Amino acid sequence: MLQYSRYPFHPPLDAYVDMALVAAWEAGATLLGYYMRTEAGMVRLKENSSPVTEADLESHRVLVRVLRQAAPDLPILSEEARMIPHAERAPWSRYWLIDPLDGTKGFLKRTDEFTVNIALVEKGAPVVGVVHAPALQQTFVAVKGAGAYRLGDNGQWVRLSTVRVDPKRIRILASRHHAGPVVQRLLERLTGAETVSMDGALKFCLIAEGRADLYYRDGPTMEWDTAAGQCILEEAGGVVRTAEGDTLTYNKVELVNPPFVAAGDPSIDWTSRIRSIFENGDWMGA
């Protein structure tokens, strides 16, 4: 298990950070065991045509075991478990939302950019977020109201902070496997834009570190894809907004997220600016 100094989080949520870190690191070690093999185990396609491997399922089992041992009364909603009806989920005021292997396609292609995502959700919002990238040996954590941090090489927690955007040099994140036509149009219309390719929840973390500015996702994502990363980015000073300008919320009737923009500079009305780009071709038109 990784060694780390105590982080600057306070009760009562600090106990949940400990639980999430232990679970993420144990699941990450399990994933690395599969990753080092020639094959990641049997691969099958889910109903939405996304791949799932033995590694996904074993990571799920590890997370559920560790989290239930630590907090047996907390419900767990996982990508790799049965779909729980909203009528059953609606009364949950606090629960774990987990993605045991975010970036399965990258995992299979050996990009190193797969993660374990764990969020503690309260009343529709993520209040604890952990994103662990085992192949990169990187761990990110955030607590609502207490900031976002990356675990440094020396075991110390490094506070994360987003940066103000340079409109002449916008660094736009694009998924390696999901860059849709709307994102392509955005890249074409932004003069001087730089593209940064990254898989999964690490896109939120790059913006939180100030290494990228903008991530626009028009394709489908699920709540477990975004909750932990959203918590990290927002606590680093960034924003995550829907096309209507609303914050992403959780434990909805349908677990599919709407299109959204994640950005580091909160001083900009990103949804209006992006709309202006498509309508006028002018970044400063909004």
Residues of each region from the PLM?
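Oxyanion/phosphate-interacting regions
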Residues: 1-22, 185-189, 205-286
